[in-house]
């Protein structure tokens, strides 16, 4: 404001004073008065994805969209975000519009299902009203809507099976997001919308894939993640998991178009150890010569699966490698106490 004319400055101050009198203190302010605000984030539980997102996780007070084909890992990633928020003492809610949430699987991923607020709404309007009420409470840290495609407008549910309802869902989403955006930002809640894929008919050139629910979510979302299964993980004759790639197609809080790759193991979720090995090799913290993986003088094992198993059995080594990677990317360091408690929880849930 140094170069602005004194009369203009005085006029701005007077206008700001009138606005504060009318709408309350804090309704208008100069951005520099508060200093540079630090963008708070909730970890995704996946080191490579936290790095790709640029701020160490999904930003608080923003709308996130996760979309991809069936069985690609959308719900798994969302549940990991819920688990990470709960570990830090946060509250979480899950709007299960698909009526397909598996509490046993959620528990295995580290979600505290006893404290998880769950709703299985009958209509899209009901789902979004519940979402608004929970966000407005200011007590929820992470809220997941699974999924946008399952938010069926009331008129469609009450109508006949063959009736045409063009644009109803898009109008519903557009209206809801207009109402929700400000509330989400004030409450500092992460709202994750899971979405499916559809194909446009008659597209000859370009990408025929699109997401249901109209265009509003594309605009209002601060982060959009495209998640795909790229390979199967085999052990012997059986398939034990999926290799997954996430592309950050939109990011308002950091540079976009970054990618992350990780393992999603069946009944376990995202493999933390596999992620540490992969990122460690990429950053030259873990050395790979032939099939052998080593960290300094410590031999982790021959083959990636053996290296993963070694880190699982030696959490202190895994923590040391992880914190070196986190330091390199200026991410908050992981704590030993938390990591061991997570190990115990995982072991207990697998035994049960």
Swiss-Prot record:
ATP binds at residues 68-75. It comes from the Bacteria. Its main location: cytoplasm. Gene3D superfamilies: P-loop containing nucleotide triphosphate hydrolases. The keyword DNA-binding applies. PROSITE patterns: RECA_1, RECA_2, RECA_3. The keyword Iron does not apply. Keywords: ATP-binding, Cytoplasm, DNA damage, DNA recombination, DNA repair, DNA-binding, Nucleotide-binding, SOS response. Pfam families: RecA, RecA_C. SMART domains: AAA. InterPro entries: AAA+_ATPase, DNA_recomb/repair_RecA, DNA_recomb/repair_RecA_CS, P-loop_NTPase, RecA-like_C, RecA-like_N, RecA_ATP-bd, RecA_C_sf. GO terms for biological process: DNA recombination; DNA repair; SOS response. One of its GO terms (molecular function) is single-stranded DNA binding. It is found in: Cytoplasm. One of its GO terms (cellular component) is cytosol. Belongs to the RecA family. Can catalyze the hydrolysis of ATP in the presence of single-stranded DNA, the ATP-dependent uptake of single-stranded DNA by duplex DNA, and the ATP-dependent hybridization of homologous single-stranded DNAs. It interacts with LexA causing its activation and leading to its autocatalytic cleavage. This is Protein RecA. It comes from Clostridium perfringens (strain SM101 / Type A).
């Amino acid at each position: 404001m140094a170069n602005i004319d004194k009369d203009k400055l005085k006029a701005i101050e007077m206008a700001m004073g009138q606005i504060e009198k009318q709408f309350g203190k804090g309704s208008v302010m100069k951005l520099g008065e508060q200093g540079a605000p630090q963008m708070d984030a909730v970890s995704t539980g996946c080191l490579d994805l936290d790095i790709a997102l640029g701020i160490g996780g999904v930003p608080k007070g923003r709308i996130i969209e996760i979309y991809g084909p069936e069985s690609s890992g959308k719900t798994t990633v969302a549940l990991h975000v819920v688990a990470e928020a709960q570990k830090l003492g946060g509250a979480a809610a899950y709007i299960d519009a698909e009526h397909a949430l598996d509490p046993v699987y959620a528990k295995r991923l580290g979600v505290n299902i006893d404290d998880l607020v769950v709703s299985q709404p009958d209509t899209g309007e009901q789902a979004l009203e519940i979402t608004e009420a929970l966000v407005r409470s200011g007590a929820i840290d992470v809220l997941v809507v699974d999924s946008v495609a399952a938010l069926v407008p009331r008129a469609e549910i009450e109508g006949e099976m063959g009736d045409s309802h063009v644009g109803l869902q898009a109008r519903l989403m557009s209206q809801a997001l207009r109402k929700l955006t400000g509330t989400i930002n004030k409450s500092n809640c992460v709202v994750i919308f899971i979405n499916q894929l559809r194909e446009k008919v008659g597209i000859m050139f370009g990408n025929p894939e699109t997401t249901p629910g109209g265009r509003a979510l594309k605009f209002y979302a601060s982060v959009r993640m495209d998640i795909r299964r790229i390979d199967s993980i085999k052990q012997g004759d059986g398939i034990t998991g999926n290799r997954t790639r996430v592309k950050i197609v939109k990011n308002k809080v950091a540079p976009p178009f970054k990618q992350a790759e990780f393992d999603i193991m069946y009944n376990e979720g995202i493999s933390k150890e596999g992620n540490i090995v992969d990122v460690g090799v990429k950053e030259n913290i873990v050395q790979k010569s032939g099939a052998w993986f080593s960290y300094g003088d410590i031999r982790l094992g021959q083959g990636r699966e053996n290296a993963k198993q070694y880190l699982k059995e030696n959490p202190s080594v895994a923590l040391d490698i992880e914190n070196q990677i986190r330091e390199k990317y200026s991410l908050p360091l992981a704590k030993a106490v938390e990591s061991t408690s997570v190990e115990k929880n995982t072991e207990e849930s697998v035994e049960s």
